[in-house]
């Protein structure tokens, strides 16, 4: 398969945890981003308090000489306050991905709620990037051909495309990437992996689903009802040997949709324990603009792998986890989690210009 004509160049660390802030003592990581009505770029980091309790904060991105260099903290925008976002001994709203969905004129945040039955994907929306209104947990339509119910399984790495695409039926649709996890041993010992019919590889892979654009325009609650899901990208390269997941919202490029993703290799613990001994690296895939279910190209090697100290050592070492991409002054910058402890920035560049 054709390789991806893009590369990432590491810029540096933009945000580290504040040891004097009890909400940040266990790390800042895996941010979303959004442009505010004031023309400023805002970062939405996952901040982690003692006991692995995560919140989503907001910070203004400080730009110097055309590139992001620091942040100005502005407080918390989402906490695990809803009953389905916390359990008896756990809580969290985690790993936001934020997409400005142009046909709706809205910023859509997808995040992971760490509730009583483990991680569950959810959504919130905003018009001003300050106040976020929850739409609730994500639900997947029943598809008899899968011989399964996607709602049984934890699902992470959900992210919207920024513009409408043709759905499988040809109707204008909003496309959503998601990543189901089939192993149910965390819920009931011995249950094991239960992939749907037709899926022979039970490693977590990237799926795509759709929301009818006309329906979403009439009723925003429709955004949480994802239909017509199917797997599109399974682990293939060596750095994806354990699992793969979507990163930022896909970026429109001349070749199609550029999707940055994380690939995971090495040890994989059961359940939701930190994956010590694993390695997270950033790769890229290009999806067809006319049919994003079709892969045009993918990277055989990582675009960015853990190398510097902030990426190698932290709460979970050896992690590069891309979650946001923004254009500043004609240059594309990727924001990523570093070792589950800090936030870094890299520049995305074409390699064949």
Description of each model-found segment:
Residues 245:
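Short, conserved clusters of charged catalytic residues that mark active-site
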Residues 1-26, 30, 34-91, 100-158, ...:
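Beta-rich carbohydrate-recognition and catalytic domains
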Residues 325-327:
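Electrostatic interaction modules used in gene-expression and signaling proteins
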